[in-house]
Amino acid sequence: SVNTLKKFGGLEMSDIQHEKEYVNYHKHSHYSNIRTIDCITKMEDYCDRMKELGHTVISTVEHGYQGNVHGTNTLAKQNNFKMIVGVEAYYVPDRYVKDRRNFHIILVAKNTNGYKDINRIMSEANRTGFYYKPRIDDELLFSINPNNIIVTTACVAGRLREEQGRKEWILKMKNYFKTYYLPIYSTSE
């Protein structure tokens, strides 16, 4: 059943917007290995390292789904962390077309309604957009209230990797979503 973020000990983004703490919202755990072998780190290991670093916010953002929300919530409570929930979704132009090509996109809930929106579109992606992976398209993405989620371009598998239509896509996202970001990754050693 859909429960509220508050019930899960969740985090409203206003709780951290004025703090200067680094929050790793885009990380994966061993739960992402359902479809893509991406990470062997367990959430317990993240918690241990987060305590060493003095972090106070844990996220559950996995490939194609929100991850083990209940388990992460239990760990958050045990470690006195706040929790945020998101998904690294698979974005396609049309979820009804059977084509394995996709782009990654991160959706992070800013509030309880954002959490419900992510649950809703990912459920629909599994029902009507599943082709090897649950895929979302503009119809699902733009059905989300733009005030309820943070959207980022994810990683090297995101939409920015394809030059054709890149600028138009960025503007479309920026013009709809109130919090749309293009992350910067360090590639230096």
Residue ranges with predicted function:
Residues 1-189:
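Phosphodiester-processing cores and adjacent nucleic acid-binding clamps
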